[in-house]
Amino acid sequence: QLHPELKDDQSLQSLTQYCTEIDHFGEIHWPEADHVRYEFMLHELIRGLEFQDPHSDEQQLHFGFTCLDSVYASLTLRHKAQELLEQEGRPFELPEPKALAIETSNDDTLKLAQKQGYELVVRKDPKLGSIRIKLRPDTQFDLKPVADLIHQHDTEGTWYYHPSGKMFLNGSSKHRDQRPSPLTLAEVVEIIKQAYAK
């Protein structure tokens, strides 16, 4: 073994499994295997680059390695998000929708939880104090009742209600002048429960 310290690296294992699957033409078993969306995947992009410039092996290698490094970084964030959801995620009861709350700085937990079936996810960043509440786009609900109630309880934080009705966001990494909410995660969960009580 060249690097025994990488034996338990989940991200590297995921990357290796994916590359092996592609090498064995395993994508024929994917759902809607002939769908155009798969042309946007890494192995097809490398093939497209080869078609564009068939004589530049160095350019293809550089592009491929840059993409693989990026995928490895994304996988590391995803595996960490999965671990956090399992250890720190707190499902809470609503008549509808299925909901989960989590306190973490890892923003990947939001999307991953939604992909796992949670329709509403609320995340509070313990470092920044910001809060993000999101609904899956395919839900029949919107966050207007939640937004209205939060505005009654929080007059300090800067909140943004997305026109889709599926996102209600406090704080922003792009706009540093926005104020975090003083509400705790537990308080936000209680407000959400009140908003959707039947």
Write out the residue ranges for each language-model feature.
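Internal, conserved structured core segments that host functional sites
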Residues: L2-R90
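Gly/His-enriched, cation/cofactor- and phosphate-binding structural elements
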Residues: S74-K198
